[in-house]
Amino acid sequence: MGSLQTPTNLSNKSCLCVSGRVVKGLRVERQVGLGFSWLLKGRRNRKVQSLCVTSSVSDGSSIAENKNVSEGLLLGAERDGSGSVVGFQLIPHSVAGDATMVESHDIVANDRDDLSEDTEEMEETPIKLTFNIIFVTAEAAPYSKTGGLGDVCGSLPMALAARGHRVMVVSPRYLNGGPSDEKYANAVDLDVRATVHCFGDAQEVAFYHEYRAGVDWVFVDHSSYCRPGTPYGDIYGAFGDNQFRFTLLSHAACEAPLVLPLGGFTYGEKCLFLANDWHAALVPLLLAAKYRPYGVYKDARSIVAIHNIAHQGVEPAVTYNNLGLPPQWYGAVEWIFPTWARAHALDTGETVNVLKGAIAVADRILTVSQGYSWEITTPEGGYGLHELLSSRQSVLNGITNGIDVNDWNPSTDEHIASHYSINDLSGKVQCKTDLQKELGLPIRPDCPLIGFIGRLDYQKGVDIILSAIPELMQNDVQVVMLGSGEKQYEDWMRHTENLFKDKFRAWVGFNVPVSHRITAGCDILLMPSRFEPCGLNQLYAMRYGTIPIVHSTGGLRDTVKDFNPYAQEGIGEGTGWTFSPLTSEKLLDTLKLAIGTYTEHKSSWEGLMRRGMGRDYSWENAAIQYEQVFTWAFIDPPYVR
């Protein structure tokens, strides 16, 4: 391995991270996006102090030494001995420095020749590719979470790190003055500052770091992330400066691999950026428009991951100048609304759409299920981007999200009344009767108990359940619904509980332990979503032996296999029921099939339970599929060079 050179403007202090731990003191200043003439002015032939870390090939040990080098300035980036970039700015350059790098590579080559002689007769073993992966995300559990995005970016990085990859997650450091601030208690200030030029001003950001579960969790610190509310808004709605907040995140994330000496080494230039949803969609654009023209990140790749295409980061066209992109790149993000969607006759419909830009320039595109990857190429599911996505279908893939199999495990779950497993289902009955008792329902182990867990809104199909309840209540069943959302649905749930006191229970709000108990105690889980990119509740349900009934859409269609009692020589196959079209009549028909199977065919029902519990929806399984897409990304040259 060649020598690794840290940024040239280091002080004599030190702040290297060793095995994820930080020694405080070093301050590294980075100027991002400065003009050529500004950086040249008054900085020619200066003396700089640099720290070289030369790695030993044989044992991985490192030797650090200080060198005073008289260097001229060239446009580009400072590079370490292996050719990786250390900070994007005008860099010192010297013939002597280049010669040193060549010599170090020659030494490595000689060492390799010696090693090859000693190992000629050794059997060749397959080499597993490993990657430097940078997740860029608006949320990552347990630090920040509002939905599935937080789950993915909190769990998938750890699964990839466990498989040998070097993984960094870059997200904002949200502080709202409440108990949630404690989640960042172990994050240490790296004392590294980057100056980002966007929105017509220079913004300084800091970086905090925690090394946990093999992952470098990096948090971008700025005053715009310090306010009450969620990552996106408060009780009054979405924050008006979200475009600014996530533009800042994207710029900072692009600098992080170059300037943060995590574990003593920067991630360097050859890495893979995984930009999640519109909040991070500017990253592929910055790589293509701002960095690669100057030879920086020429070996990097970018993947945009679409968790919900309904959210695209659309803003007025006049805000383009705020993004920090060159003027000639406007066409990449230009988005014009159709005439019928404009506010008035003089409205040109012209906007900027950063997700559109990411789809246009990223090396590959991912969604959170195979079904959703197809749906977003249709006019019904693409939200205006279907034609662009169809044009890039050759690099579009879907990978089903995993679940935390430790947190969601019926044999160890601390929230449920009795533990059970695929080999011993007896504890599930105890979970059911305990749930009935907790909710104040008649304790009836043989009565089908139907559950719903989710947001109370149109997308989740709550109106379909509302229409079906009067007829469903005529059957011998019990129903429990947990969720919050639109007031009309919350009021309807309370009213329905008063009408059917022995059959219906409403829990308005959200409670994690209760969601576990409903998942374990119910026999059937309803998910009549209009669209569902992936969905997690159906995966939790199957792991707990609860049978999902879902609308045939997106990830629901991918993960729930229809029950066929006649397959496998009468043993049956499938893990639940899907239905389409999305109507209350079709939902009721499917429920009647399920209830009939539950009451009259116990062995078939037990088979459904065991097959669902036996499915592998772990993050490790998902990580293997992500590795394949990463490999494909590096087979081809960058899509935009």
From Swiss-Prot:
UniProtKB keywords: Amyloplast, Chloroplast, Glycosyltransferase, Plastid, Starch biosynthesis, Transferase, Transit peptide
Induction (record text): Constant expression in light and darkness.
Q: Under which EC number(s) is this enzyme classified?
A: 2.4.1.21
Lineage, top-rank taxon, reads Eukaryota
What is the enzyme's main class? transferase
Record pathway: Glycan biosynthesis; starch biosynthesis
Q: Name one Pfam family in it.
A: Glyco_transf_5
Location within or outside the cell: Plastid, Chloroplast; Plastid, Amyloplast
Primary localization: plastid
User: Does the keyword RNA-binding feature in the UniProt annotation?
Assistant: no
Q: Which Gene3D superfamilies does the UniProt record give?
A: Glycogen Phosphorylase B
UniProt tissue specificity: High expression in leaves and very low in tubers.
Q: Name one GO cellular component term.
A: chloroplast
Which terms does the UniProt entry file under GO BP? Answer: starch biosynthetic process
UniProt entry tagged with the keyword Transit peptide: yes
The signal peptide annotation in the UniProt record is: none
InterPro entries the record matches:
Glyco_trans_1, GS/SS, Starch_synth_cat_dom
For ADP-alpha-D-glucose, which residues are the binding ones?
K145
Catalysis: reaction(s): [(1->4)-alpha-D-glucosyl](n) + ADP-alpha-D-glucose = [(1->4)-alpha-D-glucosyl](n+1) + ADP + H(+)
Write one Gene Ontology MF term. Answer: alpha-1,4-glucan glucosyltransferase (ADP-glucose donor) activity
Described function: Plays a minor role in starch synthesis in storage organs (tubers), but may contribute to the deposition of transient starch in chloroplasts of leaves.
| Protein family according to the UniProt entry | Belongs to the glycosyltransferase 1 family. Bacterial/plant glycogen synthase subfamily.
List the protein's name: Soluble starch synthase 1, chloroplastic/amyloplastic
Q: What is the lineage of its organism?
A: Eukaryota, Viridiplantae, Streptophyta, Embryophyta, Tracheophyta
